[in-house]
């Protein structure tokens, strides 16, 4: 079958799709990855075939222009709809309005959607897998009759929030599942998607938001309840297009507990800032009887006033190679870093401060596999004390090992491919372009 993956142009949101894309290719399926031109180099560096669509999203302008308002609205706010009192009607309406106006419509602007639909009409994919903010994928699928699903790399709290918001509005999901095919006037996301689909003469229903099903790479302990089908899949680390090289020093077992410090890749390549100063983090580890590996680029290093003797600075090292040698990790809360540490069984200190990073860190702490240190509460003493606890108390390592086992109990991307073949055959609204909709090895 033909499979089209699509993600807006940010590496952190694309990387989670690479292992499944390659599993599909290895099973004999044709795969294309569509995104704005800025992601083309990353797609091709992953060995995949890129389809540039639209123009590059102006994320830097968004952050500079309305970023303070967006970030202040979301910062340090849990997104867990199941926690009483967390998500007020005012917050949910503000979230829906702000995210649709300043983010969703920016990364799925009309030229991007039009180009993606045009490509899908010509190439006729059987299945479209879309990053959960890249609603253009759902639009293209509904226009062309392809089956479609969201590919999740982080807990699906955004969908829980949407259900909570629609319930507060007293609005049933539009379409066959419950509503009358129209959206509530205060449902900004639904209104925009209804208008966008209307440009192609296609009615809106809630599948344009939810997908027909989801492929979820998050362990079950972190998945909120879902009213849509979910295909669980093991997270397989792909740490981006940087050089995946094991340096000489990493081939030698550490003589002291090794701790990874990383503030992620997104802040290096975008206007989204790190909330915790690098200098503060390194001061917190100074003098401890540990070996610290800090992944910092030249700009981040320029902010340092002092490098402790127990700190090794490296520009880039693949986390999936580094973390198996580590006793702990201190990080910014990014989903890729968090997921890689989780599947490697490494206790974590996550300094999450926005969106789902807060809830992932809080849940990790509740499960005993790490500690959450909100970015606005980070001090040298507080971070040092938590790190000492993480290293000294065996319960953290044991809990992290349990989460690793949970993650490993999920099917691999290769094992998920036959499931996707069956679901595609069930949900595709047209006949396949040519015979052979399943791979030869599947009966």
Swiss-Prot record:
EC number: 2.4.1.326
Gene Ontology molecular function: any one: UDP-glycosyltransferase activity
The keyword ATP-binding is assigned to this record: no
InterPro entries (alphabetical): EryCIII-like_C, EryCIII-like_N, Glycosyl_450act, Glycosyltransferase_28, UDP_glucos_trans
Record-linked CDD domains: GT1_Gtf-like
Signal sequence, start to end: 1-23
Catalytic activities: dTDP-beta-L-rhodosamine + aklavinone = aclacinomycin T + dTDP + 2 H(+)
Function: Involved in the biosynthesis of the anthracycline antitumor agent aclacinomycin A. Catalyzes the transfer of the proximal deoxyhexose, L-rhodosamine, from dTDP-beta-L-rhodosamine to the C7-OH of aklavinone aglycone to yield aclacinomycin T (rhodosaminyl-aklavinone). It can also use dTDP-2-deoxy-beta-L-fucose, TDP-2-deoxyfucose, dTDP-4-amino-2-deoxyrhamnose, TDP-L-rhodosamine as sugar donor and epsilon-rhodomycinone as sugar acceptor.
Protein name in UniProt: Aklavinone 7-beta-L-rhodosaminyltransferase
Species name: Streptomyces galilaeus
Species classification: Bacteria, Bacillati, Actinomycetota, Actinomycetes, Kitasatosporales
């Amino acid at each position: 079958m033909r499979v089209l993956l699509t993600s807006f142009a940010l590496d952190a949101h694309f990387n989670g799709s690479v292992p499944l894309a390659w599993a599909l290719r290895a099973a004999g399926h044709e795969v294309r990855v569509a995104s704005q031109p800025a992601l083309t180099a990353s797609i091709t560096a992953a060995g995949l075939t890129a389809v540039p669509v639209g123009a590059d999203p102006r994320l830097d302008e968004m952050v500079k222009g309305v970023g303070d308002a967006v970030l202040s609205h979301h910062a340090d706010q849990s997104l867990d709809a199941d926690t009483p009192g967390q998500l007020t009607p005012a917050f949910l309406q503000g979230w829906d309005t702000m995210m649709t106006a300043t983010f969703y419509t920016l990364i799925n602007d009309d030229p991007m959607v039009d180009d993606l639909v045009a490509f899908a009409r010509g190439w006729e994919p059987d299945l479209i897998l879309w990053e959960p903010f890249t609603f253009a994928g759902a639009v293209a699928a509904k226009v062309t009759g392809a089956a479609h699903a969201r590919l999740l790399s982080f807990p699906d709290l955004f969908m829980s929030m949407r259900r909570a918001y629609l319930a507060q509005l007293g609005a049933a999901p539009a379409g066959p599942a419950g509503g009358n095919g129209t959206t509530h006037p205060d449902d900004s996301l639904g209104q925009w998607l209804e208008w966008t689909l209307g440009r192609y003469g296609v009615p809106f229903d809630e599948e344009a938001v939810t997908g027909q099903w989801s492929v979820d790479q998050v362990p079950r302990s972190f998945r909120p309840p879902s009213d849509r089908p979910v295909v669980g899949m093991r997270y397989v680390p792909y740490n981006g297009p940087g050089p995946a090289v094991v340096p000489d020093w990493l081939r030698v077992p550490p003589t002291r507990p090794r701790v990874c410090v990383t503030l992620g890749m997104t802040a290096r390549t975008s206007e989204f800032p790190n909330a915790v100063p690098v200098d503060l983090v390194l001061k917190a580890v100074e003098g401890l009887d540990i070996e610290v590996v800090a992944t910092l680029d030249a700009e981040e290093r320029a902010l340092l006033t002092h490098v402790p003797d127990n700190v090794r600075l490296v520009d880039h090292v693949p986390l999936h190679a580094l973390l198996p040698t580590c006793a702990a990790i201190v990080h910014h809360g990014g989903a890729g870093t968090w997921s890689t540490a989780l599947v490697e069984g490494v206790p974590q200190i996550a300094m999450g401060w926005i969106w789902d990073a807060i809830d992932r860190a809080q849940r990790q702490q509740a499960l005993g596999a790490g500690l959450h240190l909100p970015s606005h509460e980070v001090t040298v003493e507080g971070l040092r004390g938590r790190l000492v606890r993480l290293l000294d108390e065996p319960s953290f390592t044991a809990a992290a090992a349990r989460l690793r086992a949970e993650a490993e109990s999920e099917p691999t991307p290769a094992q998920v491919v036959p499931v996707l073949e069956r679901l595609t055959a069930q949900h595709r609204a047209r006949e396949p372009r040519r015979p052979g909709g399943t791979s030869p090895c599947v009966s």
